[in-house]
């Protein structure tokens, strides 16, 4: 097990304006999945994995206490398929379930967050009467270390876009009054 500190970034409101945690202090939030990859590289964690001969990284959300941290079947599938990144999915329980949606976009598999996929798409049924977008992301992944180094490093491959995540963050106005 290797621990490292993920980076932070200023929190912004719906209009992109920086918000304050308290008068004179900018509210900060974790810098997301891309930031986690950058943190692995900047902290030396990726290099430490390389020294230990570890090529696959089990990656999941901290708030999922039920995750099977090392799933031998999932790991074997990942290695056998030759993928750089593998993700688990579950069938959605209902149309508007708040999970990401596995979708093919521009010929590539990706996850579109529920907050970004219009309701009419989330509710769309296929010819068999099943949800067209029924593959839900549980944010459990296996990542190749080289993939992390390429995306999280400082080289040309490190151009990960920021994705806006709407969260309720305690904040104050310029005078220090709680909003």
Please tell me what each predicted stretch does:
Residues 1-54:
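Conserved N-terminal catalytic core of the sugar/cofactor nucleotidyltransferase
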Residues 49-58, 66-70, 74-179:
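Catalytic core of tubulin tyrosine ligase-like
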Residues 10-11, 65-67:
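Short, active-site-adjacent cap segments at secondary-structure transitions
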Residues 62:
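Short acidic donor-binding/metal-coordinating loop in glycosyltransferase active sites
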């Amino acid at each position: 097990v290797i621990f490292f500190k993920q980076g932070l970034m200023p929190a912004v409101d719906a209009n992109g304006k920086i918000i304050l945690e308290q008068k004179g202090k900018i509210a900060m939030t974790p810098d997301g999945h891309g930031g986690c990859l950058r943190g692995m590289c900047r902290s030396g964690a990726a290099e430490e994995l390389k020294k230990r001969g570890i090529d696959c990284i089990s990656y999941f959300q901290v708030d999922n206490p039920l995750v099977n941290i090392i799933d031998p079947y999932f790991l074997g599938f990942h290695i056998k398929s030759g993928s750089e990144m593998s993700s688990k999915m579950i069938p959605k329980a209902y149309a508007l379930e708040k999970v990401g949606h596995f979708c093919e976009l521009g010929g590539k598999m990706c996850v579109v967050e529920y907050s970004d996929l219009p309701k009419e798409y989330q509710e769309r049924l296929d010819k068999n009467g099943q949800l067209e977008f029924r593959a839900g992301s549980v944010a459990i992944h296996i990542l190749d270390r080289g993939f992390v180094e390429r995306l999280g490093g400082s080289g040309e491959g490190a151009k990960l876009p920021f994705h806006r995540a709407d969260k309720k963050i305690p904040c104050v106005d310029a005078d220090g009054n709680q909003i």
